[in-house]
């Protein structure tokens, strides 16, 4: 028997995802047509022996999250439950706090997945590796170039046994080109080191004259408190993958992740990809169109376009490398490139909404998405354009490399600006 835990964080996280995270929790943001964590759940549900999927985070269990859980249980015929932390507990604190729920039924092992990663999730291969070794911790790793590796947790492995000999989270100097993917497979014994960290935190933080538990003791960071401490002790191993992988920290990385998932649909979900039909819009490359969307026959879509529920796309519209969210309207002859159009937004006739992609270097097979910074030397850096919820763009204007916060009605063109 197996279980899976998806760490979804909380509203104090995902600030780089604004203004998109104003409307829905970041883990529910649509990537390639479905909520971000649905890709995780689909992968977990395909592992033989999977009995339960647990979501752990600090979000309030509001209506969108509750509806998603109900729909996921029906679609995958698996218990999918949300466990809310009493406070933000870090990447390992929630695992220890809810250890009884995780270990209920005596699972052989349990997967732990961070919500903000895009991957092909080689979970079955990880399970095979785990069953050969039977060690407490198995990490999924991939490679990055020397410069970008400093932005991730870096792993030094024994190339023969794949034991993790050294682990450093975001080192200041080059350690290794093997990086942590944020996807793990733990044995039940893996919770014992978390207990040790909790007890040590309790001893360090407790004052002599303050009875009871120190509230900060429950905060446990898997990367710094567990992986770094146990590396080289024969407990942590790494499974390397050369499949797709990317973090989803910002809106720009969500657009890149959408492209990766759309390309995977050719093998995993070909029914989700739109096809050119007589009397329908022209489709170029991988495109997702929700069944309720209305798209004019003269529109040209793709590559790498995702169109959400209830979207209206008018005559002569050109869409490329973009996400158009629920209820948005693109009027006649608009052009949307490298952008995200928010829920219920309207782009007027002959308007142009365009951003600048921040993709990995295509000439470097180990390149990853750079950590996006909005500003450099006091200037807004070119990036994808984001229209927040219910933004109105008038006809015949240009919105270039800009971020428009929700409920704004513009009257002119903007370039390289954040419109508050």
UniProtKB/Swiss-Prot annotation:
Component of the GMPPA-GMPPB mannose-1-phosphate guanylyltransferase complex composed of 4 GMPPA subunits and 8 GMPPB subunits; the complex is organized into three layers, a central layer made up of 2 GMPPA dimers sandwiched between two layers each made up of 2 GMPPB dimers. Pfam families: GMPPB_C (PF25087), NTP_transferase (PF00483). Residues 356-384 are annotated as: C-loop. It comes from the Eukaryota. This is Mannose-1-phosphate guanylyltransferase regulatory subunit alpha. Residues 273-420 are annotated as: Hexapeptide repeat domain. One of its GO terms (biological process) is biosynthetic process. Belongs to the transferase hexapeptide repeat family. Its main location: cytoplasm. InterPro entries: GMPPB_C (IPR056729), Hexapep_transf_CS (IPR018357), Mannose-1P_guanyltransferase (IPR050486), NTP_transferase_dom (IPR005835), Nucleotide-diphossugar_trans (IPR029044). Residues 2-251 are annotated as: Substrate-binding domain. It is found in: Cytoplasm. The N-terminal substrate-binding domain adopts a Rossman-like fold and has a binding pocket for GTP or GDP-alpha-D-mannose. The C-terminal domain consists of a series of tandem hexapeptide repeats that adopt a beta-helix conformation. The beta-helix forms several protein interaction surfaces involved in assembly of the GMPPA-GMPPB mannose-1-phosphate guanylyltransferase complex. A loop extending from the C-terminal domain (C-loop) is involved in interaction with other subunits of the GMPPA-GMPPB complex and may be involved in allosteric inhibition of GMPPB catalytic activity by GMPPA. GO terms for cellular component: cytoplasm; GDP-mannose pyrophosphorylase complex. Regulatory subunit of the GMPPA-GMPPB mannose-1-phosphate guanylyltransferase complex; reduces the catalytic activity of GMPPB when part of the complex. Mediates allosteric feedback inhibition of GMPPB catalytic activity upon binding GDP-alpha-D-mannose. Together with GMPPB regulates GDP-alpha-D-mannose levels. PANTHER family: SUGAR-1-PHOSPHATE GUANYL TRANSFERASE (PTHR22572).
